Amino acid sequence: MASQVSLTAQGSGLSAPLNGPEHLTSTTVENDPRLLDILSRFNREKIPERAVHARGAGAYGEFEVTHDVSDICDIDMLLGIGKKTPCAVRFSTTALERGSAESVRDVKGMAIKLFTGDGEWDWVCLNIPMFFIRDPSKFPDLVHAQRPDPATNLANPAAWWEFVCNNHESLHMAVFLFTDFGTMFDYRSMSGYVSHAYKWVMPDGTWKYVHWFLASDQGPNFEQGNQTREAAPNDSESATRDLYQSLERGECPSWTVKVQVIDPEDAPRLAFNILDVSKHWNLGNYPPDIPVIPERCVGKLTLKKGPENYFEEIEKLAFSPSHLVHGVEPSEDPMLQARLFAYPDAQEHRLGPQFSDMAAKRTGHAANDAPKTKKPAVPLQKQSREHAEWVSQVTSSSWSQPNETDYKFPRELWAALPRLRGEEFQNRLVVNMAESVSQIPEDLRQKVYKTLALVAEDLASRVESLTEEMVVPEQRPRL
């Protein structure tokens, strides 16, 4: 009987008859359990990509305490100058898919997993110190507005601008995003902000509201961002390549970790609500009439090496704002409260129910995964009635409605740009906005101009003038 040799995926031969009715119901696959195993593993080797922050790059490093902060925290990792903690960091784009270009105008993510003696502590940061919304129920609409058109799968700036025009709290971050910070870009030069207020709790139950951030010691690198955008059609991986090549050269990027602190009794007296993540904690840049919340240095985070297997070591990491350690509590910020549920739920969908046990084992930090001794939780000291009434704002019907600070913060940002970065920096904001708005229908363009006028008349007029010059003839209204 004539026969041929079939090869499995591993190159092993298997004789298979070419003819004979008795063999019609018996296949090579059925006779080779190893091939069944190979194919089944291949079918399952990919996992669902993240709903946001799908495209990423990562590295390993360590955090070192450089300043004494024992007067404001009881966090073991931060107590003791010179104390070092290993960490894994994942950088990412935000809105687009895993295969998208890194150079697109987009918010960037910086997630840090610290392997402390008390367990994993995650810092889930963005490179912009505020967020688009304060009402978590709007989050799915926000993400959908940044996705490709569901009919054509093409970029859809109209959906994005429609969202901004209908949700004015997003104007602050929108103005920031259309500066060169939106494309300033390599991962080493961007800073990271946790954005939300957290609580640092002392042993006696007293506590402070805090916001911490990582200031890049390399950046910002606007020139690199402009070069990256120009090269985007030919190089969609420039930021990842820059990170890994710098580590191979022994150039270890670092970030200075700083914290801002507010007493809970002082929070209601500020001119904005620190539980509103669409606003930033003023460092002295803007607005000029809102109190400065000083920064304090905490430590230094330094990256040392890249992963040996990105998929296993970085892509399968599960970050969440709910991964906290003793001495840290979440604030009442509604967006943060929603993320405490949404992140673990998304990770379970992506990685399976055992995702929380994987990170330390994969990254080689299993020894630090479980606390050796667990400190008892400390009851938080109760605050005044004034503070309680202030906190109740986040559950009021007016919380998701526009208020004057939604226009004040972007207005002050727009006005401060020439002072902070120069007039040309402000001019490029106008150009960047016009390039985007020129791609949307005329009726929506008019809506955008009216919305921008709520921020600043000169911003609106300058964007309108340049946009209408850019509009292609087919988009102009016919007479």
From Swiss-Prot:
Q: Name the needed cofactors.
A: heme
TM stretches of this protein: none
A Gene Ontology cellular component where this protein is annotated is: mitochondrion
Active-site residues per Swiss-Prot or TrEMBL entry = 53
The biological pathway it contributes to is: Alkaloid biosynthesis; ergot alkaloid biosynthesis
Q: Which UniProt keywords apply?
A: Alkaloid metabolism, Heme, Hydrogen peroxide, Iron, Metal-binding, Oxidoreductase, Peroxidase
Chain residue ranges for the region called Disordered? 1-28, 365-385
The disulfides recorded in the entry are: none
Q: Which GO terms describe its molecular function?
A: catalase activity; heme binding; metal ion binding
In the Enzyme Commission scheme, what number(s) does this protein have? 1.11.-.-
Q: Where is the composition biased (Polar residues)?
A: 1-13
Q: Which Pfam families match?
A: Catalase (PF00199)
Q: Which residues bind heme?
A: 343
Which biological process, per GO, is one annotated for this protein? hydrogen peroxide catabolic process
Matching entries from InterPro entries are given as: Catalase, Catalase_AS, Catalase_clade1/3, Catalase_core, Catalase_haem_BS, Catalase_sf
Note the PANTHER family from the entry.
CATALASE
Name the protein family.
Answer: Belongs to the catalase family.
Q: What does the record give as the function of this protein? A: Catalase; part of the gene cluster that mediates the biosynthesis of fungal ergot alkaloid. DmaW catalyzes the first step of ergot alkaloid biosynthesis by condensing dimethylallyl diphosphate (DMAP) and tryptophan to form 4-dimethylallyl-L-tryptophan. The second step is catalyzed by the methyltransferase easF that methylates 4-dimethylallyl-L-tryptophan in the presence of S-adenosyl-L-methionine, resulting in the formation of 4-dimethylallyl-L-abrine.
What name has this protein been given in UniProt?
A: Catalase easC
